[in-house]
Swiss-Prot record:
The lineage of its organism: Bacteria, Pseudomonadati, Pseudomonadota, Gammaproteobacteria, Enterobacterales. Its cofactor is FAD. It comes from Salmonella paratyphi C (strain RKS4594). GO terms for molecular function: flavin adenine dinucleotide binding. InterPro entries: FAD/NAD-bd_sf (IPR036188), GIDA_C_N (IPR049312), MnmG (IPR004416), MnmG-rel (IPR002218), MnmG-rel_CS (IPR020595), MnmG_C (IPR026904), MnmG_C_subdom (IPR047001), MnmG_C_subdom_sf (IPR044920). It comes from the Bacteria. GO terms for biological process: tRNA methylation; tRNA wobble uridine modification. This is tRNA uridine 5-carboxymethylaminomethyl modification enzyme MnmG. FAD binds at G13, G14, G15, H16, A17, G18, V125, S180, Q370. PANTHER family: GLUCOSE INHIBITED DIVISION PROTEIN A, PROTEIN MTO1 HOMOLOG, MITOCHONDRIAL. Keywords: Cytoplasm, FAD, Flavoprotein, NAD, tRNA processing.
């Protein structure tokens, strides 16, 4: 039977991608249905209890700048906040927070249940309704059919998921949850390339059985950072420390002596695991010269005794896991409350997607999260927001939108996936971005909030706060530009006390702030340049914009040159065999990838600059050279 009301957008899956997709589509005024196998696990942190980190924190800030949910949720649930790379330049600084799993899930569910235009329904999905290469709905486990103009798949590790502990394995979407086997079979019937990936998680430890007195503590930062541009530290719950222990030679001997019982090394697992989050058995074998590995003992929440030992993800048998855990300092009497495991699951080649995350082959079908080959809550949330946005726009008969590589880490993520694909779980790093000086955490709102407003994602409150911040930045920069001090002025002595070389000529506030030794806080503590801005976000922008002005201008020039290629469009139906002068290898790769632009084509492995030149000349001769606005 069909449900009585049709929807504009259906989201299948209630993890980090699905919840962002649902919130986004509903926020844009589209009637949205979120289908989940269990309402109680909406926003569940399946693996580590943390949000953010290098590259990942940048994505969270971008999601927030576009009106998304993740930053607000972690501000309400974070039990330890830190700035990573704090001593380095602003481009690579990143926020990270330990999370209370229960509080995080509560924050997400509360937001979903209070979002207008959004209905949540608990039922596993087993089939899609596809008519003439267009998705028009979904079918649940009990045969109930829902109609919609667009469907977003955010199914995580559930597609034909298989859990491995030692040489034993069983079907599961994650520990304690069933897999989605009928939907996996249905998707394999569609003209989509599918493969398998693997990820893993460590055993969870009972905190009452750990001797914390012999371990080093790691505290959060003070003052506490916040994730959301709309947030403040008063929203944070109680803050707690993490603890540090290490593996040792005894640990490594246990692992080496039991490799024959590892499903990875015994050849039972076929899926490829994450390169940058390897299992402890992988670390011991790949880095044989290391006699120890640092392990962070992270609390799972304020009301839980569970500890997440970050760094010992494993699929070894339970008895071996016990030996590994008890070989480490402070853990000699530790008890495991949940065994670690590896999970294999289906993912679909993201090269079969448009940059909007819509399938190239099934109109109206969008993919986001681990189904696209990524790993991590933050990568999933960013894709979920983009897929939800474009599903909503499609249902409203509007053109899709995707950010450029020069505009956002989300743009880098999507371009990497859609252009290059992935053979292993993809995670974000700052090193993946060519323009990382422009793509900082601190300016995510300056880069994206105006566009978010145009797209209908940014509410009036955020928009007013954003414009106030812009005005504060502009007013303060003008004030510093027009405030001068001369070497002979009474205030010069106070200024010189903060400089490595004294003033030799008249200088403005901006001139002084450009000096490496002068901070904004120091400058505005001087009588001549007081008072400081009360808006801390605006003050940070003033300092960064002034100090890095030359570098930022140079990078902006590079971006403008590159945009010429990015905006030169390639016809979706072009058969590259028609283009004389291209090698067979280049023709095969271009026909396989079907790049949307010259810029995207230039990033495909094996497509040379010479091939790009040939292609541009051919397009011009054919009168097919056109650029997007």
């Amino acid at each position: 039977m069909f449900y009585q009301d049709p929807f504009d957008v259906i989201i299948i899956g209630g993890g980090h991608a699905g919840t962002e997709a649902a919130m986004t589509a509903a926020r844009m005024g589209q009637q949205t249905l979120l289908l989940t196998h269990n309402i109680d696990t909406l926003g569940q942190m399946s693996c580590n209890p943390a949000i953010g980190g290098i590259g990942k924190g940048h994505l969270v800030k971008e999601v927030d700048a576009l009106g998304g949910l993740m930053a607000k949720a972690i501000d309400q649930a974070g039990i330890q906040f830190r700035i990573l790379n704090a001593s380095k330049g602003p481009a690579v600084r990143a926020t990270r927070a330990q999370a209370d799993r229960v509080l995080y899930r509560q924050a997400v569910r509360t937001a979903l249940e209070n979002q207008p235009n959004l209905m949540i329904f608990q039922q596993a999905v087993e089939d899609l309704i596809v008519e003439n290469d267009r998705v028009v709905g979904a079918v649940t486990q009990m045969g109930l059919k829902f109609r919609a103009k667009a469907v977003v798949l955010t199914v995580g590790t559930f597609l034909d998921g298989k859990i491995h502990i030692g040489l034993d394995n069983y079907s599961g979407g994650r520990a304690g949850d069933p897999p989605s086997i009928p939907l996996s079979r249905r998707l394999r019937e569609l003209p989509l390339r599918v493969s398998r990936l693997k990820t893993g998680t460590p055993p969870r430890i009972d905190a009452r059985t750990i001797d914390f007195s012999v371990l080093a503590q790691q505290h959060g930062d003070n003052p506490m950072p916040v994730f959301s541009f709309m947030g403040n530290a008063s929203q944070h719950p109680q803050q707690v420390p993490c603890y540090i222990t290490h593996t040792n030679e005894k640990t490594h001997d246990v692992i080496r002596n039991n490799l024959d019982r590892s499903p990875m090394y015994a050849g039972v697992i076929e899926g490829i695991g994450p390169r940058y989050c390897p299992s402890i058995e992988d670390k011991v074998m790949r880095f044989a010269d290391r006699n120890q590995h640092q392990i962070f003992l992270e609390p799972e929440g304020l009301t839980s005794n569970e500890i997440y030992p970050n760094g010992i993800s494993t699929s070894l048998p339970f008895d071996v896991q016990m030996q590994i855990v008890r070989s480490m300092q402070g853990m000699e009497n530790a008890k495991i409350v949940r065994p670690g495991y590896a999970i294999e699951y289906d993912f679909f080649d993201p090269r079969d997607l448009k940059p909007t995350l819509e399938s190239k082959f099934i109109h109206g079908l969008f993919f986001a999260g681990q189904i696209n080959g990524t790993t991590g809550y933050e990568e999933a949330a960013a894709q979920g927001l983009l897929a939800g946005l474009n599903a909503a726009r499609l249902s409203a008969d509007k053109e899709g939108w995707a950010p450029a590589r020069s505009q956002a880490y989300l743009g880098v993520l999507v371009d990497d996936l859609c252009t290059l694909g992935t053979k292993e779980p993809y995670r974000m790093f700052t090193s993946r971005a060519e323009y990382r000086l422009m793509l900082r955490e601190d300016n995510a709102d300056l880069r994206l909030t105006e566009m978010g407003r145009e797209l209908g994602l940014v509410d009036d409150e955020r928009w007013a706060r954003f414009n106030e911040k812009l005005e504060n930045i502009e007013r303060e920069r003008q004030r510093l530009k027009s405030t001068w001090v001369t070497p002979s002025a009474e205030s010069a002595d106070e200024v010189n006390a903060h400089l490595t070389t004294p003033l030799s000529r008249e200088a403005s506030g901006e001139d002084l702030l450009r000096r490496p030794e002068m901070t904004y806080a120091q400058l505005t503590s001087l009588a001549a340049f007081a008072p400081a801005l009360e808006d801390e976000q605006a003050a940070e922008q003033v300092e960064i914009q002034v100090k890095y002005e030359g570098y930022i201008a140079r990078q902006q020039d590079e971006i403008e040159k590159q945009l010429r290629n990015e905006n030169t469009l390639l016809p979706a139906t072009l058969d590259y065999r028609q283009v004389s002068g291209l090698s067979n290898e280049v023709i095969a790769k271009l026909n396989d990838h079907k790049p949307a632009s010259i810029g995207q084509a230039s990033r495909i492995s094996g497509v040379t600059p010479a091939a790009i030149s040939i292609l541009l000349v051919w397009l011009k001769k054919q009168g097919m050279l056109r650029r997007s606005a």
